[in-house]
Amino acid sequence: DVCKKALKPNGTFISLDVPKESAFGFMYLLAKEVGTFDHPFLNGVMPKLPYPHELCCAGVWHSTEEKIDVLKALGFHDFDFYQTLLKNPMYTNEDVEDVVPGYQSGGYVAIIAHK
């Protein structure tokens, strides 16, 4: 609600995040649960440059649908979604990925909502 009050009338709210339901979200939640990236469950699946483990442990993870529901409940409307990191995490450093519309496949998602 504080963010909505801070926006001018017809303002735009932008959220960029790793969705809980994405491959990256699952990987980071597992690393948080086991306390390290250096765990047999994560061998061979980690990207070369993961987020710092401290960020994974400190993060509060939510699904994109949860975020949309909260924004709608706050009165936001006219949503746009963009995503990237569509490859499995261990392959993300091989090529630059373009941003594409949507949110169901990306490991990093932008939600754009209007007041």
Located regions from the model:
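Short, glycine/charged-enriched secondary-structure capping and boundary segments
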Residues: 1, 28-31, 95-96
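A short glycine-rich, Lys/Arg-flanked "PGG" loop and its adjoining helix->strand segment in the class I
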Residues: 1-12
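Conserved class I S-adenosyl-L-methionine
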Residues: 12-43
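Positions that flank functional sites
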Residues: 21-22, 85-87
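Class I S-adenosyl-L-methionine
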Residues: 48-55, 86-100
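Short alpha-helix
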Residues: 58-81
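Core SAM-dependent methyltransferase catalytic element
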Residues: 74-77, 94-115
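C-terminal and late-domain segments of enzyme folds
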Residues: 83-84, 104
